[in-house]
Amino acid sequence: MGLEVHILGTSSARPTNIRQVSGSLISCDEGIAVVDAGEGFQSRFSNQRKRMKTYESYHLKSSRVAVLCLTHGHLDHTWGVLPWLQSMALDNRNQPLLIIGPTSSEVVESLLENTTLPEDTPHSDLSQQFQFWHKLGGTSENLGYQVRWVLGDVSGDRWVEFDTTTGKVIQLPKQPQPQGWRNNRIDALATVHGIPSCAWKLSTKEKPGKFDRKRAIELGLNDEQRAQLAAG
């Protein structure tokens, strides 16, 4: 399959009569990436699953969600995260989930040094929200399934992970990918906003073209050259 994009919300700041706040799904052959989860996200996800099942005979299973990509910490993009995580726990989810988003280089340094966050850190910075959600039960231990909490200084390509068991923050060698993904990947792209933010790109590996054996013979290619072409 290719990539399927399901836009579940595009409204800014608050819902309107015809639009809901941010939340989208990108489905690929290896799973689903969720981009932002504003207020009421799980209800919109549920409604979209019903629509797809009824009209397209297609199952948009929440168990296939492998990663939640957050673009920034404003609540119209994040307020639905914790309720949704709790609901998946009630559904006995056992698949791992990666939650990843942007922060500032100063916050990354503070987290690694285990010092108080800089005074000018916005209240809506994801570092503050992550720690708040952990206190409210958003950990692997409380939810019953593995959740990785990762923040990054996108421009500097520095990534850290919260170890909710020990309370420590660990620096990662590179931006992590959803577990088990081999043919698809996510990448953060720096953007400009009032707080640390990023866009997310989901890309898929190109499949090799069909090997034209007849044309290879006409060109007089040897066995080694043919094997290389056939392998893509």
Tell me the role of every PLM-derived stretch.
Residues 1-232:
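Binuclear metal-dependent hydrolase catalytic cores
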